[in-house]
């Protein structure tokens, strides 16, 4: 946890930073490692996960998970400028980048100098982070290690627990002594893939396919369910069509991110949860017993059943499971109302590998 300080540039500064980033990016893209995926053109988190799975399934199923403590706030300016100076020889560009690094931030309406770190919120910060951590990539490649890195989130995959512990010690030492960064030893650990959470994904071993596969991590699922409950809250005073619109945004975004994982059964469960909660929202929207009975009959529920349900006084949660209500507010009718199904989205092809 904790609060990150954002250095939000002015419009002019943002324009200048973007211009510099556009010049520097193609130069450094030629130097960056193939297994670096964060903040790079035509690369994404899903590609990092697919590469990690390939490595795990080659027998490298001991994971070194190194956590960099407040990386963006602790980058050493002199070390970073030295690294940049090896490639960029234009003094004006070097000067502008350094001025950007020391531009400072506002905290509680008071200016504070930036002695270390790259101000988050600017166009240059992600590129500078990759320039610094490319030194780590080169060191890991020199040691012959299997790794993937997404910005400051890096995992290394080796074949044994003994090797993993040795790599943890050696790479942590390199990060702290050579790069001047801080490793959070409390959060860093050696583990099997089943104990790993990486970029929101969890991992498991498929006994039938005899290989590791990815899935949404339990914490990612919990976060999704929390947001889904907020969007289907009965006391939220907006129309049900608006709720469906916001739900669809959540469903599409979450499913498109995690669709490379094994999630068919999970999608079926989550689709059911959403339909259940929407039925409660619709029941509340109908308000009076008379109106509820009338709407149920419009949806082909027999008159006797419609009035029994409308006047029974059961709680919303119980009524949403009622067979007649499920037959009235069917999956097909919710779909025609505009609700998107997770299950229908997961069959879209996986991202292209770089």
Label every model-predicted segment.
Residues 346-352:
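Conserved small/polar residues in nucleotide/adenosyl-binding loops
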Residues 14, 18, 22, 26, ...:
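Short, residue-level hotspots on alpha-helical faces of the histone-fold
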Residues 31-43, 47-197:
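Conserved polymerase palm-domain catalytic core
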Residues 259-311:
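Conserved nucleotidyltransferase catalytic core and NTase-mimicking acidic/glycine-rich helix/loop elements
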């Amino acid at each position: 946890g904790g609060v990150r300080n954002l250095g939000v540039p002015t419009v002019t500064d943002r324009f200048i930073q973007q211009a510099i980033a556009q010049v520097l990016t193609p130069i450094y893209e030629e130097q960056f490692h193939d297994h670096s995926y964060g903040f790079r053109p035509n690369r994404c988190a899903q590609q990092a996960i697919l590469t990690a799975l390939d490595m795990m399934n080659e027998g490298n199923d001991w994971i070194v998970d190194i956590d960099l403590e407040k990386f963006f706030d602790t980058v050493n300016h002199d070390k970073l400028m030295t690294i940049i100076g090896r490639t960029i020889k234009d003094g004006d560009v070097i000067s502008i980048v350094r001025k950007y690094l020391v531009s400072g931030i506002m905290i509680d309406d008071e200016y504070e100098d930036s002695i270390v770190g790259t101000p988050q919120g600017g166009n240059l910060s992600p590129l500078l982070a990759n320039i610094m951590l490319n030194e780590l990539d080169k060191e890991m490649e020199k040691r012959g290690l299997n790794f993937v890195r997404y910005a400051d989130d890096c995992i290394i995959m080796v074949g044994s627990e003994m090797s993993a512990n040795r790599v943890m010690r050696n790479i942590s030492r390199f990060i702290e002594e050579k790069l001047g960064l801080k490793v959070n030893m409390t959060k860093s650990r050696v583990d099997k893939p089943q104990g790993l959470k990486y970029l929101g994904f969890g991992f498991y071993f498929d006994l039938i396919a005899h290989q590791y596969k990815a899935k949404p991590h339990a914490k990612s699922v919990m976060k999704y369910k929390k947001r889904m409950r907020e969007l289907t809250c009965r006391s939220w005073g907006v129309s049900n069509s608006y709720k469906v619109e916001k739900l669809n945004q959540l469903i599409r975004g979450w499913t498109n991110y995690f669709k490379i994982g094994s999630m068919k059964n999970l999608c079926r469960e989550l689709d059911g949860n959403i339909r259940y909660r929407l039925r409660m929202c619709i029941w509340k929207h109908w308000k009076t017993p008379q109106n509820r009975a009338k709407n149920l009959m419009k949806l082909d529920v027999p008159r006797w059943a419609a009035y029994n349900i409308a006047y029974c006084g059961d709680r919303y949660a119980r009524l949403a499971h009622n067979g007649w209500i499920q037959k009235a507010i069917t999956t097909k009718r919710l779909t025609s109302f505009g609700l998107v199904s997770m299950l229908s989205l997961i069959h879209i092809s996986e991202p292209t590998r770089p």
